[in-house]
Structures are given as structure tokens and as C-alpha cells.
Amino acid sequence: MKHIFKKLHRGGNQEQQNRTNDAAPPSDQNRIHVSANPPQATPSSVTETLPVAGATSSMASPAPTAASNRADYMSSEEEYQVQLALAISASNSQSSEDPEKHQIRAATLLSLGSHQRMDSRRDSSEVVAQRLSRQYWEYGVLDYEEKVVDSFYDVYSLSTDSAKQGEMPSLEDLESNHGTPGFEAVVVNRPIDSSLHELLEIAECIALGCSTTSVSVLVQRLAELVTEHMGGSAEDSSIVLARWTEKSSEFKAALNTCVFPIGFVKIGISRHRALLFKVLADSVRLPCRLVKGSHYTGNEDDAVNTIRLEDEREYLVDLMTDPGTLIPADFASASNNTVEPCNSNGNKFPTAQFSNDVPKLSEGEGSSHSSMANYSSSLDRRTEAERTDSSYPKVGPLRNIDYSSPSSVTSSTQLENNSSTAIGKGSRGAIIECSRTNMNIVPYNQNSEEDPKNLFADLNPFQNKGADKLYMPTKSGLNNVDDFHQQKNNPLVGRSPAPMMWKNYSCNEAPKRKENSYIENLLPKLHRDPRYGNTQSSYATSSSNGAISSNVHGRDNVTFVSPVAVPSSFTSTENQFRPSIVEDMNRNTNNELDLQPHTAAVVHGQQNDESHIHDHRKYTSDDISTGCDPRLKDHESTSSSLDSTSYRNDPQVLDDADVGECEIPWNDLVIAERIGLGSYGEVYHADWHGTEVAVKKFLDQDFSGAALAEFRSEVRIMRRLRHPNVVFFLGAVTRPPNLSIVTEFLPRGSLYRILHRPKSHIDERRRIKMALDVAMGMNCLHTSTPTIVHRDLKTPNLLVDNNWNVKVGDFGLSRLKHNTFLSSKSTAGTPEWMAPEVLRNEPSNEKCDVYSFGVILWELATLRLPWRGMNPMQVVGAVGFQNRRLEIPKELDPVVGRIILECWQTDPNLRPSFAQLTEVLKPLNRLVLPTPQ
């Protein structure tokens, strides 16, 4: 820069330099010029110009000069100083528009919290509006302390290129370029916007009518005001977007502008509604944050408001579907949300930083900056709606529910003695009400040991009914503390926390071998119908004192023992029965204790006797026959059981189950039309050597290294499963770019389409049979080795064949789905069927599938869509954080209602297993109570 200034000073003015050399001014005059000019330049520029002046003065001649020469020098020096000031001004203006410096300044403002209010006061209102508008354009956030001022405008880019470049047009450019096709904007201008002025007056009246403690009521009234002004509520935001597109075109044609005052927008999309709500909230001093981006809304161009209640918790405000509904924001803490600005050329939404290691507060401690984990725990400790005699919790509609502070937990004695229904209230006594959908809050006490209506209590003989705590078994031989992790549990009255879990192991996987081995010896040997699971007793077993006996015939009086840990108090009983059973089973085998050959003979004989039920050549495998038969699995040697880790890493096992045996060349498949789009790929109808098949091709073909090995490992697992209620796996294409799995083709399609098509009338007994099919298919997955957790069980993944048999599909690929619902910044996913722990991204086991089955049973019983009228974001908040459940209709059979509620237990360990569900569903003969005549 110094050389440029010298060039400006010397270039084209050689005569001035000559005159300066001939006759320089006195040194005192030189000093006057130097001291007079620094206010026009920066300190750095002054230091740079001083040597030049010094050099000029040193070159001056001590001889006196004429007045004309002195005047020429003064004019040339003044010209130089003007040029210097212009250069410095241009340099400063360029640096102020530097995007990097602007980002650094914005980051400093955001991190300080106060946003330098003193500097903002010095700026004019136009400068503040321009700064806030640019901040919202680039970073997508206006914080609680930032008020929307007049001349603030929100620009919507219709051109993706401009958005990527971070080019934000000024308000003057938008107003001068009439009808600019690349942008449209809404502006806040109270003096000229009469509609906005009226809305502000209404908001002031609403605030005066609400007490200072009724913040949720104020939020609801403001949300209803915004929604009513901008076209009303809508279940589908795409419909509102289409209406706005049409309306904006009319505005542009009539007004010849692309800038619309916010008050004149009568059909508003989410960004318009959120901005108007922010303006109204600022006017009534309601803390409100305006956030734009896909983190909350699923769309980069949508916006949402978050409000902070007096307990320092943040909630999202619904302004589209159900105005005024508050949904807890998925921040780890209200105070630990560090908003960092992102690159303006990339994602414009600031990233929220979480900490997964937030220390959990003990009871008695409190903080306004508590973590979401503590918030979830407080929800779990909250008193839920009390249970009535009909076992249905009848809770009033949820609307203004306050989740700010947990109330004391009601004892189980009070819950039992109270036969009336308590209407749920918030901490401030507001009655819970809702105008759209009635949801039930699952009472934690409904399955307590003292509850006589516990449907599954008799199925668990190892439950200590008289104790406050259940026996917690320990695993012998597992001494490495680092390999354990504590499962997150809800503190419940009268219940102990869940047992420790082995990493990468399902909850019932490790002790399953020993427990089922004991149970098999405790109960008589059962011949099971391989299709329907019917049991017939081959012989009865009794103890020496006659305490235990069993005689099971068909479906009647079936007692099924859940696979729970065996207390040490039963060790003597186990040893008591084992010798007699072993002797009876091996009386023809020369007293050899080899159980598996005998079991194989029994199965072989059963297959020969019952081959008319279904084709065993299709559903059985000679090389691996333990995939779904619990008898074979229970009698396996303990040393032969493999967990998921050892199964993947043992080379010998991998060689025995080579993927090459089920490899299908891509060229052998004749691909036809596409019949579906799943959560991980496209589904095609294809032909494979004359056989109709379904080909599921992955959308993400970038599989290499560990991911490809994981895919092949899942193929081995699916290859082993043979069950009439599991989609038959034929093979796989294991070579990119055509990674696919090939299964049987089921022409009737998904159960979802059958249940929810118009005028669908399915016989009630057929629907019961469908529920039983799903339970038996899932029991096959959960009892396999290793245990297969579906994690995406829903009616769209249940397929129906020509004989109306329901089969479980899309299993075994949960680990290949890289994004869960919360980790993915899109609305992809189906939270309507997901368990609360899955929606919260907490560790989950196979019991999450049991919750999903409860939703499926609810669908089969009611023939209604789950959570109809709510968008996915609302379902996540309702189920995952507010502990809400679907309403159980009064016309449902009480047994069916209790089964569904048992599946929806908040604590996964309290949910029944699919083995228990199968036994309970078998004698079921109705879903709905008969209509009184």
C-alpha cells in the first residue's frame, strides 16, 4: 500500500518533484503539514507517510524560496493528502464487506450474548435492521435478546445459486428491481403496515388479559392469532406452500414488487408465521427465538420459534398443524446451547453443541440449566393419570400441559384405592385439554407387582410379588468392567433399575441360553406346530413332592415362561428336575447325555407327521436348523452359543457360512417396474430364472471396507432365517454398484396399504390372525442367535401373501441405515411406530420392537392411522419427551387394551416378550366389544 501511495504522489507530477528538490519549504512549515493531516488517516498510514515527509524535508534546500514555489508545493501536497484519504476510505469499505471479517464479527456478537448493545444504540435503525437481516440470512437465527426492528426483511431466494454464494440483496435493490424473479421478501414496517399495527394492538390486549405466570396460555393465544391471520392451520405444509406460491404471483403482478409487508400476507408459510410470531412476542416482552433451517423443520428454508419458560427450558411452538402446541426442543441444556455461525456458502444454520457427558443431578438438587436427561427423568417421576377399574387411563385432552416441574409420586396404594379418574394437571393447576386428538399418558403403576390386572404377571413365575425389588442376577465370568455400560432407566417407585447390559448385546441375549435350558427342563417337552405354534404335550413331568405338574393340550391353558434371569433360590429346584428329564429323554440312548441327536430325531419325526401344514423344504435348512425353533436353540451346548461380535470375527464361522453360497449375479435378474421406495433403497419387481422376486437395491452404494463386511455379515444372518412369518431371503448381490438383497415376491403388498385403503373391511378374526403372525415372526427374530432387533417394525414393512399370511420384512438391516430419525436432518423416518427411547436416540434393545408391535395391534384393532393429523416433529415431541400415547378407544376389548398398554410401557424391561404376546394372542377371539342391541 505504501508503494501505491508513493506512486500516486509521484506519478505524473515530475515537475512537483523537481520543484521540491529545488526549493523545499522550511522545516517548521513541513511539521505543520504533517501535524494537520493525521486526522484524515489511520495511525498506520501516518507512520508510513512520516518517512516520506522526512525524506522530502531532508532533501530540501536551506536557501529561501519564492512564494510561487511554496504555493505549488502546498497544492501538490494537498492533492496527495486527498488521494491518500480516498485510498484509505476505499480500503476500509472493502475490508468491512469482507465475508470472513463479517463472520468473525457476527460470531463475536453471538458469543458475547449481549451483542454489544452500546454499539447498536449508536447505529441508526436502518443499520440495525440491515445487520439483523443479514445475520438472519447468513446464520438463520435471531436470539432472545434481539428484537425485530422496522425495516427488517426476510429474503427468500428462489435461485439456489444465489443462496450458495451467500449474496443477500439489499432492500433498496429489491424495491428498485420490480418483480425480481430470483428473490422475494417480507418486510417489517410498523408505520406503513396497518394490518401489523392492528395485530400488535390485539397482542397487547391478549397480554393484558393473561397473568404473568400463564406463559403457555399467552403463547397459545399468540399462536392462534398468527395462524388465523395467515390462512389457518394445515396438516400438510406443502398445500400452504402451493397456495402461497399462487398468491405471491398475484401480488407481484398487481403491486409490481417482490417485497411484501408482513401484515399483508394472508396465506403464510412457516417462515412468514415464525417471523410474525417473533414480532408479536417482542411487543409483549415474551422471550422468543427465531430459528431457520432443517435442524427443526426438515427444510432449509422453513423457520420455527422457540420460547423459554420460567424454568429455563426451551420449547418449539407449532404454528402450522396445532397452533400453540409446545414441544420440548432437543437441546441438551437450555444454557449449554452454543450457537456457532457456519460458513455462509454452506449450511446457514448454526450448529447446536451438545455434551453427552452431562452429570446427572441427584434428588434434591436443582438448576435452571439442567440437562435434557434430567428433564426426561423428571417426566418419568411425574405423577401420571390414575388407572380406572377398566384398566384404561382416561386422561383429558392434552393442550396446555405444563411440564416444568415434576410433582410428587403417588404411592401404589393410593392408586389402587382410587377408583375415580384423576384429570391430569400441570404444576400451576391448569386442566389439560386438547381440541384435536386425545392421547393417553401411560401410568407407570399399571404393571406393579400388586396390580391384580397385570396381564403378564402369571406368565412370569420368577417375579417376586411380595418384594419391592426384583432379584438382579449377575453374570459369572464377565469381569471386565469396561465392557459394560449402564442402561438408562427411569427411576420408578417399588422397582429396581434394569440390569447391566453387555455392549452390542441385546438385553435377553447373554443369559438366554442358561435360562431357556432350565425352563425347558422345568416344563414338559412340547411338540409345537411349526406354523401356528400350537403345543401338544408328549408327556407330563412332576416333581417328587408334586409341586409342579403340567399337561398342555393345544391352545388351552398354555403357560409360557418369559426368558428372565433365574434367581439362585431356584438352583436346587433346577438340579432336582434335571436328572429325571435327562433320564427320560435318553432312556433309549445307552444313558448317554447327548441331547441334540434326540432333539433332532423328535423334530424330524414331527416334520414327517405334520408335513401337510406347509412345505418344510422351503422353510427349513439342513445346514443351520436353529434359526427360529426355540427347542433346538434351548438344547444347544452353551459353549456353542455365539454373540454378534464373535459371529462376525470368527474366521471359521465365516467360512462355514460363506456368502458366496447365496450370491446372485446381477445379470441373472431381469428388473421390471419399481414397486416401492423403502427407508434404505428402492424395491423392484424382478424375475430370477422364472421366479418372481423382489429386489431391494440400496440407494447408498458407497460400501467399502468395514461397511461392506457389515453388509455381508447381515446377509449371513438373514440367510439363516427360515420361518413362515418372515419374508423368505433368497440371496444377495454383494458387489457394488448393485448392492441388493433378493427376497420372495408377495403380491398383496404391505399390510399398511391393506388396512388403510378406502372402504377397507377386513374380518376381525383375520386381523387377530395377522397380529399373531407378526408376533410369531418377531419371536423368530428375537430368539435367533444372534438376536435380530428390527428397530423399524411398522405396517409398511409387513407384507401379505396370497393366503393372507403376514410376514416380517426389512429386518437385519438396521445397522446399515446410517441415520436415525433424530440424527438425520430430514423428515425421513416413521416416528409414529418408534419407541420413546429410539426417538430420543437412547440405547435400545429388542424391546423397542415390542412397543412398535403395540402400535400395529392398535392399527389392526381400530383400522385407523396412528397419530393422524400430526407431523413427524410433533410425534417425536409427544411420544419421546411428553410420554403421550395413542388413545385406547372405549369400544376395544379390555384384554386387547391391556395388551397394547403393556407394550407401551415407558420402561423397556417392563414390556412383554413376543413369546408372551404369542401365547396371549392365541386364545383371543375378538378385538372390539359387541355393539349393544
From Swiss-Prot:
SMART domains membership: S_TKc
Say which family it is in. Answer: Belongs to the protein kinase superfamily. TKL Ser/Thr protein kinase family. RAF subfamily.
Subunit structure, briefly?
A: Interacts with KEG. Binds and recruited by EDR4 at the powdery mildew (e.g. G.cichoracearum) penetration site on the plasma membrane.
Which ranges are annotated Low complexity under compositional bias?
A: 53-68, 367-378, 404-413
Which Gene3D superfamilies does its entry note? Phosphorylase Kinase, domain 1, Transferase(Phosphotransferase) domain 1
Domain Protein kinase, residue spans:
669-925
Regulation: induction: Accumulates at the penetration site of powdery mildew (e.g. G.cichoracearum) infection.
**What's the domain of life for this entry?**
Eukaryota
Result, substituting K696M: Loss of kinase activity
Question: What does it do?
Answer: MAPKKK serine/threonine-protein kinase involved in the regulation of a MAP kinase cascade (probably including MPK3 and MPK6) that negatively regulates salicylic acid- (SA-) dependent defense responses, abscisic acid (ABA) signaling, and ethylene-induced senescence. Also modulates stress response (e.g. drought) signaling and cell death, in an ORE9-dependent manner. Functions at a point of cross talk between ethylene, ABA and SA signaling that impinges on senescence and cell death.
Give a yes or no for keyword Hydrolase in this entry: no
Q: Which organism is it from?
A: Arabidopsis thaliana (Mouse-ear cress)
Q: Which InterPro entries match?
A: EDR1/CTR1/ARMC3-like_pept-like, Kinase-like_dom_sf, Prot_kinase_dom, Protein_kinase_ATP_BS, Ser-Thr/Tyr_kinase_cat_dom, Ser/Thr_kinase_AS, Ser_Thr_protein_kinase
Keywords of the record, alphabetical order, are:
Abscisic acid signaling pathway, ATP-binding, Cell membrane, Endoplasmic reticulum, Endosome, Ethylene signaling pathway, Golgi apparatus, Kinase, Membrane, Nucleotide-binding, Nucleus, Phosphoprotein, Plant defense, Serine/threonine-protein kinase, Transferase
Q: What is this protein called?
A: Serine/threonine-protein kinase EDR1
Give the EC number.
2.7.11.1
- Name its GO BP terms in alphabetical order: abscisic acid-activated signaling pathway; cell death; defense response to oomycetes; ethylene-activated signaling pathway; MAPK cascade; negative regulation of abscisic acid-activated signaling pathway; protein autophosphorylation; regulation of defense response to bacterium
